[in-house]
């Protein structure tokens, strides 16, 4: 019989006594006992955020010193490894010269070298993005002692392949955190 007051019973102040059943209890009057200034409220909010009462804001650039939990986020991709030359830069706008530059390694449509391609035909017939370098060219190949254990597949936007290839790093452990 809630709400019934028995003789000799003092009224219960709900601001002082709160049970676990009153999680959603809101007091009738705001700031019954103390008034908090906006500066103090901002300071309290910062303290609560530091103590993880709020949802923690993840660092978009995790470091190895942060430990393994920093790398457990599901949206981590191979771009987080920071391999230049394989993935298009987000802030780069393609110009007309970049679109006409020969950059594919597909042997079904084009020769392997840019110079070979210019010697064989019209350089304006191939319209591709310059974000994926041609790894068949010797100037893009790593040194002989560095090229062991790698299988590097650049992106090939030609009609024969129909898929975008990414570098396969077969030396550095499981691919699961980076290729989901």
From Swiss-Prot:
Key words of the record: Cell projection, Cilium, Cytoplasm, Cytoskeleton, Flagellum, Nucleus
Keyword match ATP-binding: no
Source organism, top-level taxon: Eukaryota
Gene Ontology cellular-component annotations: axonemal A tubule inner sheath; cytoplasm; nucleus; sperm flagellum
Primary subcellular site in the record, as a coarse category: nucleus
Tissue: Testis-specific. Detected in the germ cell lineage at all stages.
Pfam families linked: TSC21 (PF15217)
Cellular compartment(s): Nucleus; Cytoplasm; Cytoplasm, Cytoskeleton, Flagellum axoneme
Keyword Membrane set for record: no
GO biological process: flagellated sperm motility
Function statement: Microtubule inner protein (MIP) part of the dynein-decorated doublet microtubules (DMTs) in flagella axoneme.
Quaternary data: Microtubule inner protein component of sperm flagellar doublet microtubules.
UniProt name for this protein: Protein SPMIP9
Species whose genome carries this gene: Homo sapiens
